[in-house]
Each structure stands twice: as structure tokens, then as C-alpha cells.
Amino acid sequence: MALLELRDVTRRFGDFTAVDCVNLSIEAGELFTLLGPSGCGKTTLLRMIAGFDVPDSGQILLDGQDIANTPPEKRPIHTVFQSYALFPHMTVADNVAFPLKMSGKTPAEIKKRVEKALEEVQLSRFTHRFPHELSGGQKQRVAFARGLINRPRLLLMDEPLGALDAKLREDMQRELISLQKEVGITFVFVTHSQDEALALSQRIAVMNQGQVEQIGEPSVIYSHPANRFIADFIGKINLMAARVTQVSDNDMTLEIDQLGTTTLPLKQGIKTGDQGVMAIRPEQVSVHALARHAELPHAHTGKVLDFLYVGDVTTYIVELDCGIRVEALLANSSPGRARFFEVGDPVIVSWTREAAQFLMN
């Protein structure tokens, strides 16, 4: 049985449907992420799980019991917010101890559990400090410790790393993964950051316009997006308008605007006449000097319009002779990458048959 299960959960605000008939299940001990653009309904969904909002219809089951109308204080769930929500007049220890004091625990038990919680988040030396004496990352760890102190069945996190700088955010991602493995509590993480979701999650639910578009492991979401929206939202991708002109037992032929025809492995459910896009990730596009044209599959000539060097990789924008622009991501440590292509250089771009996929609009 899943720890948390949502069945046909819907929430409306007047004529606007914020969450539209969402179904998903989350297993015990899982680090699960709700990912989507601003306004997609992910925070509204989190608020209903926490008990801060009530669905208009549907069920929210925790350990098989419907808690959709249970007050938040009666749920074994804690929420960590981006703003930390620490009490400025309390020390770190008092902030972490607050839930225990409210539930009437003895001073001895409170002391023991606070020490354990601060040890888990590596803040044992900061017991007597106040929030204004802490860095952003330290404040976030205090919020995590307070969220875990009562050992909830579920820890909800609403974009908790959004206020941190990029380097600290990466460090906190690693700490979160380690912490979740150590305590074994189910984490549900809400974010609009694709990189964050891919780095943190065991599974991701991608939301758009109040609905769940796809649920899966990060590698599946990235490599095999269910549709054009997910492909375009998760990472960078080249999209070329295409139409299916022929389907055989194992292959499908696409007519690509300006580029011509190409043959790809057949996807289940695709039929002749379907409209969509051919999608290729930039890291799956190769850039070569013109001399290699004859030996390359799916090769097209063009010229370099621009490039962006960022240390370990270089992104090239190549305009093909047919007018289509293609983005390629090349590792600077690759063999033969001793020189970079310059703007205006004539080049060949190519990709393998397996790198491209057809996605419905």
C-alpha cells in the first residue's frame, strides 16, 4: 500500500481550476518531487496534502485513511517553507524544540531529541545562536531539523532551496539526499527548477495547467518525455515540426519542415498523419568539420552562428543550409576538441537514429 495516495483530487477557485483530477501515489521512504512552471497547481496540491486547503472533490489517503478534511494539526505531516519561518527571538535549539513543547513532551525528552535533530543536520555547534546569526543554508537546516523533530510520516517542502545561491543550493541538495536516506522519512518536494528535481528525486510528477503530465524516474522523464511540453520544459532540446507520413512494423517515416524525411524507430500509438515534433537533446548532436560528411549518419551541413563557452562544455548554435537552427552541447574534454569552432565556420551536425524521437504536440 502506498503511504500517500491522491484520487481524482480537484481544487477550483471560482471559474479557475487550479488542480484538475490529479491521481498519484507516493511510497514510504520515497523522495518525490512535484515539478512544474509557476501557476501549474503544484503548491495548491501541496497545501491540500498539508491540510492548509481542502479539495472540492477527490480523496487524499494517508496510510489508507482519507485525510482530505482533517485539520493540519491532526495530520502526521510537517511543511518546510522557502522563507524558513523561524522565530527570530528564539535560539536554534528553541526553534527546533517548539513542536515538542507544543505537544507537551518532558524537558528531558525535548533536550535529547533536539540534540539528535541538530546532529542530523550538522548544527550541533549552533545550539545557542539566533536566526540572524546564521547563514541562509544554516537557517534552512534549522527548518529541516524542526520539520523532522516529531518524526512525521511525511515531510513537505515548498521550494525550500529557492532563496539560496547556486553553490549553496547544490550543497543543500546533497545534504537533503543524505538526510532523507538517514531518517527514512518520505519527502515531497515542490519546485519549478528542473535541475533541482532531476538531482534530488527518486521520482518526479511533472505538472502543467493543474494536471499531472508524466510520473517517472528522473532519467525516464528526461530521456523519454511523454509529450512536447515535458521535453521543452525539462532541460534544453531541439524541436523540429514533423508529420508522420508512413508507418511500418518497426519504423516510422517523418516529414520534417525544411529538413526533408527521416526514419525513426516506431513508437507505440503513433499512426500515419500524426502531427508533432522531432526532438533531439543538444548533448546528442555532434558538430564536425566538413571533411567528415560522407561517414556521418543523419548529417546536415550548416554554419556556426554563435557559441557559448562555460568551462567544461561549449554550446554551439548552428544554422543548417535549410534554415533550421540546431543547438549542440559539446564537452570540452572530448578527444579532438583542441580547437573550438568559430562563428561563421562551415560545419556538419549529425545525430544517431536513436537520439531523435517523435513527440505529439
UniProtKB/Swiss-Prot annotation:
ATP binds at G36, P37, S38, G39, C40, G41, K42, T43. PROSITE patterns: ABC_TRANSPORTER_1 (PS00211), ABC_TRANSPORTER_2 (PS50893), POTA (PS51305). Its EC number is 7.6.2.11. It is an enzyme of class 7 (translocase). It is found in: Cell inner membrane. Residues 4-234 form the ABC transporter domain. The complex is composed of two ATP-binding proteins (PotA), two transmembrane proteins (PotB and PotC) and a solute-binding protein (PotD). This is Spermidine/putrescine import ATP-binding protein PotA. It comes from Nitrosomonas europaea (strain ATCC 19718 / CIP 103999 / KCTC 2705 / NBRC 14298). The gene is potA.
